[in-house]
From Swiss-Prot:
Residues 168-283, 286-416 are annotated as: cGMP-binding, high affinity. Its main location: membrane. This is cGMP-dependent protein kinase 2. 3',5'-cyclic GMP 2 binds at K347, G356, E357, K358, A359, R366, S367, D412, R415. It is linked to Spondylometaphyseal dysplasia, Pagnamenta type: A form of spondylometaphyseal dysplasia, a group of short stature disorders distinguished by abnormalities in the vertebrae and the metaphyses of the tubular bones. SMDP is an autosomal recessive form characterized by short stature and mild platyspondyly with no disproportion between the limbs. Mild metaphyseal changes are present. Acromesomelic dysplasia 4: A form of acromesomelic dysplasia, a skeletal disorder characterized by short stature, very short limbs and hand/foot malformations. The severity of limb abnormalities increases from proximal to distal with profoundly affected hands and feet showing brachydactyly and/or rudimentary fingers (knob-like fingers). AMD4 radiographic hallmarks include mild to moderate platyspondyly, moderate brachydactyly, iliac flaring, and metaphyseal alterations of the long bones that progressively increase with age. AMD4 inheritance is autosomal recessive. 3',5'-cyclic GMP 1 binds at G232, E233, L234, A235, R242, T243. Crucial regulator of intestinal secretion and bone growth. Phosphorylates and activates CFTR on the plasma membrane. Plays a key role in intestinal secretion by regulating cGMP-dependent translocation of CFTR in jejunum. Acts downstream of NMDAR to activate the plasma membrane accumulation of GRIA1/GLUR1 in synapse and increase synaptic plasticity. Acts as a regulator of gene expression and activator of the extracellular signal-regulated kinases MAPK3/ERK1 and MAPK1/ERK2 in mechanically stimulated osteoblasts. A lipid is attached at G2 (N-myristoyl glycine). It is a lipid-anchor.
Amino acid sequence: MGNGSVKPKHSKHPDGHSGNLTTDALRNKVTELERELRRKDAEIQEREYHLKELREQLSKQTVAIAELTEELQNKCIQLNKLQDVVHMQGGSPLQASPDKVPLEVHRKTSGLVSLHSRRGAKAGVSAEPTTRTYDLNKPPEFSFEKARVRKDSSEKKLITDALNKNQFLKRLDPQQIKDMVECMYGRNYQQGSYIIKQGEPGNHIFVLAEGRLEVFQGEKLLSSIPMWTTFGELAILYNCTRTASVKAITNVKTWALDREVFQNIMRRTAQARDEQYRNFLRSVSLLKNLPEDKLTKIIDCLEVEYYDKGDYIIREGEEGSTFFILAKGKVKVTQSTEGHDQPQLIKTLQKGEYFGEKALISDDVRSANIIAEENDVACLVIDRETFNQTVGTFEELQKYLEGYVANLNRDDEKRHAKRSMSNWKLSKALSLEMIQLKEKVARFSSSSPFQNLEIIATLGVGGFGRVELVKVKNENVAFAMKCIRKKHIVDTKQQEHVYSEKRILEELCSPFIVKLYRTFKDNKYVYMLLEACLGGELWSILRDRGSFDEPTSKFCVACVTEAFDYLHRLGIIYRDLKPENLILDAEGYLKLVDFGFAKKIGSGQKTWTFCGTPEYVAPEVILNKGHDFSVDFWSLGILVYELLTGNPPFSGVDQMMTYNLILKGIEKMDFPRKITRRPEDLIRRLCRQNPTERLGNLKNGINDIKKHRWLNGFNWEGLKARSLPSPLQRELKGPIDHSYFDKYPPEKGMPPDELSGWDKDF
């Protein structure tokens, strides 16, 4: 063809058929593949169903394994405890119920338990008290400006990042981190030197800036520390012994901060925040006449919300239940007016001004728009439900304020006079027997108590010293003598706590609190002559039984609740609840002992010293936010958990891990099956992360605990009258029967004299 085109040839299949056959073959192949695909789909579905069955079986087995593991752990604990007793007896194995060791068995064996069986006992810890009246070497008053150390911006950023990577420190407020960075100072170490030495007391937190560090326990290498990592943080919470050594492998540079400065920063920032919020609230006409304790609760409830320019904080016409205080930035107020299509500007509000206060009284239809005028506007917010639960409804407050406002001119001295009159009435209630005992021991020498007393046995030992069972010579009158080593008190800077314990116990008179009769002192010890409660420690019984049933736990919790009710009415916070600090009298009633961490605080006030037992401390204590009576309610929740299970809910391999578990909270924690629904609800409500939300700290106070469903039907009046039989009833052979206490070896040597004179008024 002239155009050069080529006529196409028809393709032929090798068998001579045309291309149509190829199409048929493809169709057949597709059909075959579709059939195969359906078969595979069916096979996959079958396998998925089988996999689902396996997963369900695995889930059931996992639950069963967890239950068996828990049961095995409990039985191992009980077996170890009983083997300790058998080993000391040199006899054949004891047969006892895994759930309950009879009191008679405890009575026969507890005196034979060696000291190492107390390894499970929890010890309290404490920082130096914030008021160190009796510390003759206390440092000068803290000055933030003097503590600041110059750094360039890049160093500040690196230190800030290092602190924020730490599991504990990242929970602090940004301002607290900023102040820590400002006050950290450089410390250089030569190759081969120790930054931290195992067994020595710690006082500093460090950030590694240059060089190489390695961590040792004994001679064993544990790890190395990366650059810009924080370490040693436990030492800034309280006086503790280092559990490992940190050695410089090269020359190193660190940034350091000591405990005293850290605690002053925490207290300074929190107090400044509270004071600012308090001033804001005092400017609100609705709230300005509320008493301090109510204002403090509102302050603790306030949350911070942030808005950017143009954001509507309140919209006109909407129903609202939230009250706002402007903490930072400016907002504009606009309102619909006749003759205008758009809302018109009414005014501008600035820091310290407030809006929406009517919402605290009743449902409020917003009468205007509130719009952020700039970025990063900060508002302090509280809603009506929170306000009503923690502070009270408007009607309740109105009734309260009528009496309060009528007495606004009454000064603090008159209020304290009223309280002291109340205390005088309490002192009148002292039994004749107690008055006679006080008169008897008042005649003893103040510096030589053992001229008139003889030691019968040791009831307990601790870092402070010992508690001895003593009796009056030639008389059948017994006491417990707490002997506190003066040198230990000075070394740990606990003079204030010892004096506080003395002062507080001297004014108390409750059947749920151990009584103090007299104090003494010599060159080596200060002494407290206490009521002898010889029913034994609750901790020892819990150790031997493994856990308590619900009726026994309820009785224990009720005794503690009555003790807290009495203390809190007097303005006293306890701060060290645990089974180790609960002791039984002859009738099996519990009494609080060891008031070393107790403190009297004013209404609506907070205290700042880190103290307590690690497994029992509340989050606000760990974070140095300041704390009040609500920490006792937190610890009550932990106690309920431990009584029912044998172990506290938060317990890590070291104290810092325990604190991090506490800060994560109890809300998402799975409870063991032995804790039923009602006690679980009580524990969760007592252990709220926010102190203002805790049961006992709401507007109805401790009555909310007494009326909780788990304690429904409990005979509170019988408990207070001591007519309610105790499930822990004891049988004592006489006033010096100490068979319910563990046996302790004699004290090795005598402590050195301590003659600084801090105890002159003891």
